Amino acid sequence: MQLLYYIYEEPVTIHLGTWISLGDIVIPFGLSLDSLAMTVIVPVGIITLCVLAYAIEYMSHDPNRNRFYIILSIFAVFMTILVVSDNYLMMFIGWEFVGVISYLLISFWSTRITAMKSALSAILLNRMGDTFFVIALGLMINYYHAVDYDTIALVTPYMNTFLLNTLGLLLLLAATAKSAQLGLHAWLLQAMEGPTPVSALLHAATMVCAGVYVLVRSYMILEYTPTMLLIICWLGGLTTLVSGLIAIVTNDIKRVIALSTMSQLSIMVLAIGISAYDLAIYHLYCHAFFKALLFMGAGSVIHSFVAESQDMRKYGGLIEYLPFSYTAILIASLSLMAIPGLTGYYSKDIIIESLYGSYTLSGYILYYIAVGSATLTSIYSLRVLYLTFMGVPNANKASYSHIHESLGMMIPMIVLVIYSIFIGYSRDSVIGHYALSLPANNGFIETEYTLPAYIKLLPLILGLTLSAILVYVYEYAYKINRSAVYDYLNNRIYYEQILNNIVIRNTLRLGGYMNAYIDQGLLKVLGSTGVSRAVTYINVIVIINILYLFFI
């Protein structure tokens, strides 16, 4: 597919047939190999291959490993369908199936009750997003009489503003669920109960990016809805800040990385909110590699422990036992922190700068929020490195007795290390070549050459300064008492408790009332019970009349 794109140097559409034809509504079945699809399909293919190679060793002792490889391969097929489809309906098929496969992979270790609960939570929250996607599809078919990207792009300028705002809101809600934005984000942390290769592929590099991909693919709608773009901006800003605050007090190594994924997805959402779609996709492109590497490095640490603990407080001193894993996590963390010279610096900081370069009140405020988030990213990245690899061992001797590196897991990690270092240097070629199909938005060029140096360097300076303070705290001031703020963040701002107490419990109570007073009450009286009693009553009346006539 990449070869076709480079040969023709323009979008290539492969028409496979007509799927649905009802009057003037024609829904095609085909593939669209444009710049956007080709940019996203590259990390999907490379990381899927690396994860499958990594899983050979990681899952080598699992009796159900063949089923795992089959499900993971099927996921790659449907993720590809989601990306290269030429219409929203085909995209929705891929969207649905990656959600179902995510459920199967999170619950892969089905004997763990926590894994089953987490999988159920993940699929239910994702189904909420799917519902909004279905409604958006219905509106497109009703008003556009089409769901293919080209037709929608051509007709959108003539559509009603209210309809476009409604479509933008529905697609945003769908993306909020899939890309774990604030409000529908709880499933991503719970998804860490699945095997680590699943986290590296689905919950870092591919599936969770589907929401961002849908928003970028829907740029032709969003560009006519400035109100929705502002909402998207603020949603991304709040999510990136909240996820960073929660991450600095989280002790589960995979959950910290999941929260960093949530934060980086929010940076992409921020870019979409200022119409910098090319920057959003480029950050998605780069982020996939170093985030998959982070998960693989964490998996190497977890796999080497006898009890496979994920609590960083039980680690310590592992740099002596796992030097390669330390190097891999260090490179990925520095890239995540946007240290100059590494991939993350070239894709992440330009988005933060562009917020300031938008020259709007919201842009200025969100710039400082994003700077705060970038600072928190540096803090929790360093915290992972310190608690895991530095200091003294915190587990018992037996846990350290069999720790070793695995060559089978190292080889795919080496590939991702190379990408995490060097892929950032391709920014100009990716933005200049791949983004041809996106709206003409050259704001980042003005940002690059007009902003003062301190605006550009502020995230880096704050991140390094507060990281140094964090090292001092861990070394010399570790007896600081836990505060109410710590407990608030450690409980993930009590989101799950609020959701359970206000939404879930009241919904169940409403369901109970509906069952008692409608299903078992009104409907039962008018339905089965009422009919039964009526028949019995009629039979009695008939018998009485017959007896009366007989005696007469």
From Swiss-Prot:
Signal peptide: none annotated. Its EC number is 7.1.1.2. It catalyses: a ubiquinone + NADH + 5 H(+)(in) = a ubiquinol + NAD(+) + 4 H(+)(out). Coiled coil: none annotated. The chain crosses the membrane at residues 11-31, 36-56, 68-88, 89-109, 121-141, 152-172, 196-216, 229-249, 256-274, 287-307, 322-342, 365-386, 406-426, 453-473, 532-552. It is found in: Mitochondrion inner membrane. Keywords: Electron transport, Membrane, Mitochondrion, Mitochondrion inner membrane, NAD, Respiratory chain, Translocase, Transmembrane, Transmembrane helix, Transport, Ubiquinone. InterPro entries: NADHpl_OxRdtase_5_subgr, ND/Mrp_TM, NU5C-like, Proton_antipo_N. One of its GO terms (molecular function) is NADH dehydrogenase (ubiquinone) activity. GO terms for biological process: electron transport coupled proton transport; mitochondrial electron transport, NADH to ubiquinone. It is a multi-pass membrane protein. It is an enzyme of class 7 (translocase). Pfam families: Proton_antipo_M (PF00361), Proton_antipo_N (PF00662). The keyword Transmembrane helix applies. GO terms for cellular component: mitochondrial inner membrane; respiratory chain complex I. The keyword Lipid metabolism does not apply. Belongs to the complex I subunit 5 family. Core subunit of the mitochondrial membrane respiratory chain NADH dehydrogenase (Complex I) that is believed to belong to the minimal assembly required for catalysis. Complex I functions in the transfer of electrons from NADH to the respiratory chain. The immediate electron acceptor for the enzyme is believed to be ubiquinone. This is NADH-ubiquinone oxidoreductase chain 5.
